[in-house]
Amino acid sequence: MKYLSIASILLFTAYAQAKSLTVYTSRKEHLVKDIFKTYEKETGVKINYKTGKAGALIQNIKAELKDPKVDIFMTVDAGNLWYASSEGLLESTKSDVLTSHVPAHLRDRDNRWFGLSVRARTTVVNTNLVKKGTNISYEELAKPEWKGKLCLRTSKKVYNQSLVAMLIGTHGYDKAKSIVKGWVANKVDIFSNDTNVLKAVAAGQCAVGIVNTYYFGRLIKKQPKLPLAIMWPNQKSYGVHINVSGAGIVKNSKHQEDARKFLEWLASDEAQKQFAQVNMEYPILKTAPQTDIVKSWGEFKPNTAFNLTDAGKLQKKAIKLMHEVGYK
């Protein structure tokens, strides 16, 4: 009988481990499973994944950090990514592929996380109530002429917290507070999600709402005759606020090199095409195709001056500000 040496056993174990990666993701399973399967087919590397709420997954990673069971954390919104990195849970990753494919304002300044798909937090109007060509901006929506015309999603959602963080980063705390206070004064109602905001706008309950683009895409795909249209805000100033879904390598991951290769693949043309198609988001790569629905919205000026790392850094101030003005 032949016996394997300890060195051979360790080498075999390391090789076996490299044949799989584990991802914790707050993205819905139907949005990522086919992307993971494509990678498995192309590389032979099995992608195991666990889904859940971003906060709960971050706590799981924190609890396991000395002996992590996960290699990659994937979630929505730079605020969640920043929180994970600020807790020391993500590794700084050196990769020419990632830094060349992911624009600087859509990744962590220390390369601990990278945006993988883009969504804009835009204004959507009822076309029967708002004239085409109306100048809309986040700041304009705080003015008296929009009183009783604005629908908002709850301030408890990270998407709005990051939007307000952007306003703080752009204008300073006091001016941002004045803007959000104006929103609250002008609001018709506060809704639990973006879809309900859109339905209220379509019904004429309000003239305008602030939502993520893919929610609009999903609804208009099902009901194309709704009197709704995207009206890109801030096109005469700094541009519409954009955010990301993204990912980073977990600190102490046992498969750092393989995890980096997977992240690089997620920023490739093939994966970017799938990201764009599955949820009507904008690909990070300009060479990756958009869906026909997304193309139909036309070009817009995005806010590229605001680094999304600051959306996380300013999140606590944003939450405090919204509480102070009564934005629930």
What is each PLM-predicted segment?
Residues D292-K328:
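Extracellular/periplasmic bilobal clamshell ligand-binding domains
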Residues F12-A18:
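Sec/Tat signal peptide C-region and signal peptidase I cleavage site
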Residues S26, H30-K33, K69-Q205, Y238:
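Extracytoplasmic ligand-binding site segments that recognize negatively charged/polar headgroups
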Residues Y214-G248:
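A beta-strand-loop signature enriched in Asp, Gly, Thr, and Trp
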Residues Y3-F12:
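Sec-dependent N-terminal signal peptides
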Residues A18-W82, K328:
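Early extracytoplasmic/lumenal segment of secretory-pathway proteins
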Residues S245-A305:
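Mature extracytoplasmic/periplasmic domains
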